[in-house]
Structure formats: structure tokens, C-alpha cells
């Protein structure tokens, strides 16, 4: 009789990420109180694989995707997953319609797990969005809404 694989629900993954986020916030707060004297023991985020994607596996764009933790299914959907430090267990982050969305999900999980030392797929994204938002607000745009790759502007008259 084949063994049934144990799966985690989305609540379990969200709970694990919440605990890592709290741990990182606490260790960063403690290091501020100590004056940075004692550093917490923390596993470094993984480096990028030199192998890259497996040739001939996944969808048509899988081989050219450079995002960490992101791969394409044979039917074209993109998935994101990250490994939990210490345990090595994969945390399923979800299925997405684009590699960009999957990379954003990976980045959020990486920030939750590794804190400030996280290696991100899109490290300049928050900085670029903040500068763009500041620039647009100075142009007297009343309403600015940024959603993934779309920007909606409504000019005041």
C-alpha cells in the first residue's frame, strides 16, 4: 500500500512565516538594545544554484526564468516555494499566472524567514515604487494605485 504524502495547508505555511517574521523582529530589536554587540545565531540565506533549471523540465519558459524559488509547470502556470532553514522542508507559496508574481511571493517569504539578510529576486522594487509614488504625488495626482505591474493614475482638475 503506497504511503500518503503529508501536505501542509496554506494556514500552516502562513503560521510558519508569521513565526519566522516574529523571530526576526525580536532578534533585530534585541541587537538594537545590545548596541549590536551580540549577534544572534542565524542561518544565512541560500545562494543561487549554479545548475539552474533542469533542462527539458517544466514549461516552455522554465529554462530562461532567473528567479530563485520560481518554476514553471508544464501547462504554463508558475509556482513559488522556499526551503525552511534548519529543516530543509519546502514551503509551498502558491501557483501564479506569471513568474513576476511568483517572484514577489518568494521575496515576501524570504523577508519573513531571513529578515534583513534575505536574498531577494527583486531587491530594488520597494525603492523604485517609493520614488515613483513620491514623484507622482508631487505632480498633484489625486489617486495613485500600484498593483503588481499595473499603475492607475487619476489626475485632479
Curated annotation (Swiss-Prot):
Subcellular location, record wording: Nucleus
Motif (Nuclear localization signal): 5-21
UniProt cross-references to InterPro entries, sorted A to Z: AP2/ERF_dom (IPR001471), AP2/ERF_dom_sf (IPR036955), DNA-bd_dom_sf (IPR016177)
One of the record's GO molecular function terms: transcription cis-regulatory region binding
A GO cellular component annotation in the UniProt record: nucleus
Gene Ontology biological-process annotations: heat acclimation
Protein name, as recorded: Putative dehydration-responsive element-binding protein 2H
Amino acid at each position: 500500500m503506497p504511503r500518503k504524502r503529508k501536505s501542509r495547508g496554506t494556514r500552516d505555511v502562513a503560521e510558519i512565516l508569521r513565526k519566522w517574521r516574529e523571530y526576526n523582529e525580536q532578534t533585530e530589536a534585541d541587537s538594537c538594545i545590545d548596541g549590536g554587540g551580540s549577534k544572534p545565531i542565524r542561518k544565512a540565506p541560500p545562494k543561487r544554484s549554479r545548475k539552474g533549471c533542469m533542462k527539458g523540465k517544466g514549461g516552455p519558459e522554465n529554462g530562461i526564468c532567473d528567479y530563485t524559488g520560481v518554476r514553471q509547470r508544464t501547462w504554463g502556470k508558475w509556482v513559488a516555494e522556499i526551503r525552511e532553514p534548519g529543516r530543509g522542508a519546502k514551503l509551498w507559496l502558491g501557483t501564479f499566472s506569471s513568474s513576476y508574481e511568483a517572484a514577489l511571493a518568494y521575496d515576501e517569504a524570504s523577508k519573513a524567514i531571513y529578515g534583513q539578510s534575505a536574498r531577494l529576486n527583486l531587491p530594488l522594487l520597494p525603492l523604485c515604487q517609493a520614488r515613483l509614488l513620491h514623484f507622482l504625488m508631487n505632480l498633484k495626482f489625486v489617486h495613485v494605485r500600484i498593483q503588481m505591474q499595473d499603475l492607475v493614475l487619476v489626475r485632479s482638475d
